[in-house]
């Protein structure tokens, strides 16, 4: 039974007074100052806040306290919900970063329907913190039937992907595959590798989504390696392995994410058969991992060989312009939920300059700003540095990746990165390889055995020989010394 509006407001006022007494004035103004009563119906109270961040924080830290206080007002209350004001509980599809999606929200999919899109945190789309159980309606029945594997996130599209020098080649290859359809196979298999938080999953899901959108009855499967292992183990347990394998072989496009997690001899054996079947049948395969195929030491050598037979592209860390664009898009998305939100361009630019890691670190920095902005609206750059010290690591050595050293050295000497990892012993390859090993030892905290593994599985004594060789030469070879200084500067600039 619905409470009278005046009675509801009186109850809410009493509750907020109790809440303020329990948590203190400062915490109350920080977290609950913009809390409003939306509705009291039957046994449920619905409260609202202006941002998803506030909603997530209150739900995670104060849900039990709110329920307890409401039950003191009305023992029939069983549940307190906190929602974002003016936003339907149905998740919107991703919209361009500069505009807000004002279209009427569609009803949520019921549990019986197939197309469910879990939502996490990302730039360029729906706001952070949406629960992974949320759902949107599939655009078509064909799309519903097509995705047989892991769920897709509707925000991960090519339109919401921030491109730049570090990922432009991988993005172009991904678009080509998505647009080619089943009639033409390109770069097969396409292997995209990068460290965590640099957009691999976004790119792979964008391929799957675009392929489904382009071709009405496309048979597209997007899987994480862990999900593949679970599905296959379940199929064996249920005596359904043959049917599962046949289902996967009868597709147009297979997209596999997080290949580094594919474990188990029998599982890898079955995946190898699947990979061979699809490639031999001219079916497109796209794979992503956190390292190059040659460095996936836990994978069966036959799987690695097949993956190396295609095109491998690396996605590097975003540069300053990309980081700034990510922050701008994230702010535009947040402003769709709270129009009063305002973070100055100079603050965004400063964060883009100082937080130089992955997109996830940038997301963490923005979340800090979003949180602080609710009770520090005029935050200064000095205060930003203080808040983000754990991300910027001011005064600490820059984090330099061996893969970046290899890429920059290979480009400088006009050889391929694969040449550096190969067994070729020509002079044009040996010198760049030794230089790259030397720089890896000088500029990273990695051990000699670890560096050796990153250079095609070489022994640590090979790395030690390379380091000593360059040290011996640099004293007498002015040109080499200048090359090393230039390379160090290029590597440091990339890490900046």
Swiss-Prot record:
**Binding, ATP:** 197, 199-201
The regions listed as transmembrane in this protein's record are none
Q: Which Pfam family is one of this chain's hits?
A: Bac_DnaA_C
What GO biological process terms does the UniProt entry carry, in alphabetical order? Answer: DNA replication initiation; regulation of DNA replication
Q: Keywords, A to Z?
A: ATP-binding, Cytoplasm, DNA replication, DNA-binding, Lipid-binding, Nucleotide-binding
| Stretches the record annotates as Domain III, AAA+ region | 151-373
Annotated region Domain II: the residues are: 76-150
CDD domains given in the database record: Bac_DnaA_C
Question: According to its UniProt record, where is this protein mainly located?
Answer: cytoplasm
The record, for PANTHER family, names: CHROMOSOMAL REPLICATION INITIATOR PROTEIN DNAA
Q: How does it assemble?
A: Oligomerizes as a right-handed, spiral filament on DNA at oriC.
Q: Which family does it belong to?
A: Belongs to the DnaA family.
Protein name in the entry: Chromosomal replication initiator protein DnaA
Give the source lineage, highest ranks first: Bacteria, Pseudomonadati, Pseudomonadota, Alphaproteobacteria, Hyphomicrobiales
**Name of the gene this protein is made from:** dnaA
């Amino acid at each position: 039974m619905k409470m009278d509006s005046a009675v509801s407001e009186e109850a809410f006022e009493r509750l907020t007074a109790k809440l303020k007494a329990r948590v203190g004035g400062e915490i109350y103004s920080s977290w609950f100052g913009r809390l409003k009563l939306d509705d009291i119906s039957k046994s449920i109270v619905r409260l609202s806040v202006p941002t998803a961040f506030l909603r997530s924080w209150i739900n995670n830290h104060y849900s039990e306290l709110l329920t307890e206080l409401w039950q003191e007002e009305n023992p029939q209350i069983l549940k307190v919900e906190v929602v974002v004001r003016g936003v339907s509980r149905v998740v919107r599809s991703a919209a361009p970063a500069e505009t807000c999606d004002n279209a009427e929200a569609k009803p949520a999919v019921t549990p019986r329907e197939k197309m469910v899109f879990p939502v996490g945190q990302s730039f360029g789309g729906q706001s952070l913190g949406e629960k992974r159980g949320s759902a949107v309606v599939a655009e078509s029945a064909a799309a519903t039937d097509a995705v047989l594997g892991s769920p897709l996130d509707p925000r991960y599209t090519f339109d919401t992907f921030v491109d730049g020098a570090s990922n432009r080649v991988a993005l172009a290859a991904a678009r080509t595959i998505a647009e080619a359809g089943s009639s033409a196979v390109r770069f097969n298999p396409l292997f995209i590798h990068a460290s965590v938080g640099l957009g691999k999953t976004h790119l792979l899901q964008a391929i799957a989504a675009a392929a489904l959108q382009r071709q009405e009855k496309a048979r597209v499967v997007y899987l994480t390696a862990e999900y593949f292992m679970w599905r296959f183990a379940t199929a064996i347990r249920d005596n359904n392995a043959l049917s599962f394998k046949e289902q996967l072989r009868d597709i147009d496009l297979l997209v596999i994410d997080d290949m580094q997690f594919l474990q188990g001899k029998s599982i890898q054996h079955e995946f190898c058969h699947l990979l061979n079947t699809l490639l031999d049948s001219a079916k497109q395969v796209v794979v992503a991992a956190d390292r190059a195929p040659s460095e996936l030491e836990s994978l069966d050598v036959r799987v690695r060989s097949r993956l190396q037979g295609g095109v491998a592209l690396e996605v590097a860390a975003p540069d300053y312009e990309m980081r700034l664009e990510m922050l701008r898009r994230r702010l535009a998305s947040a402003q769709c939920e709270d129009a009063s939100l305002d973070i100055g361009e100079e603050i965004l630019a400063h964060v883009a300059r100082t937080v130089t890691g992955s997109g996830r670190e940038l997301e963490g920095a923005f979340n800090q700003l979003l949180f602080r902005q609710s009770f520090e609206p005029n935050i200064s750059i000095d205060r930003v540095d203080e808040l983000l010290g754990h991300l910027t690591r001011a005064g600490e050595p820059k984090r330099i990746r061996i893969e970046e050293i290899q890429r920059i050295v290979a480009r400088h000497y006009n050889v391929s990165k694969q040449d550096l990892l190969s067994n070729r012993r020509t002079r044009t390859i040996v010198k760049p390889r030794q230089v790259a090993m030397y720089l890896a030892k000088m500029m990273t905290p990695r051990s000699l055995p670890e560096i050796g593994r990153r250079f095609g599985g070489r022994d640590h004594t090979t790395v030690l020989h390379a380091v000593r060789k360059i040290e011996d030469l640099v004293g007498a070879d002015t040109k080499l010394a200048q090359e090393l200084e230039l390379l160090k500067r290029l590597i440091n600039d990339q890490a900046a």
